[in-house]
Amino acid sequence: MANAPVGNIYTAALMQHNSHPDYKYEMEGCTCSHEGVNPSCGDELTLQLRIEDGVIEEASFVGSGCAVSQASADMMADLITGETVEEAKRLVGLFLGMIKGKALSEEDKEDLDEAAELESISRMPARVKCAELAWRTLEKLLADK
């Protein structure tokens, strides 16, 4: 995916996660939540987590925004569910580095799973904040965990 053309950000995975998100719902019994807003385009979301014994047992989000922000949030929630807080922080760092143009190893891309498909967005500055929204919200939410 590293050589994807700039115009090809709407991958099958992105469209699937946007059209049929598995993690877009209001969670009952969340242990923490945080709101994120992208003021430049109006994307907004509330990320909700249920953390037990240092493990993210459940992740969900609610909100509205463009296909990129919504798909990125769904991919992220899928990726971090079942992971430790520390691993989720590591994954956030990988994703935010990638979306800012940092080259990742194949192993790091595998760790990001479908979220690695958003790499081509790094070459579209106007869309970077859309892709980052959920991840930056997670970063802030986990900062004191």
Predicted ranges, named:
Residues M1-K145:
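Domain-level signature for proteins that mediate thiol-based redox and metal-cofactor handling
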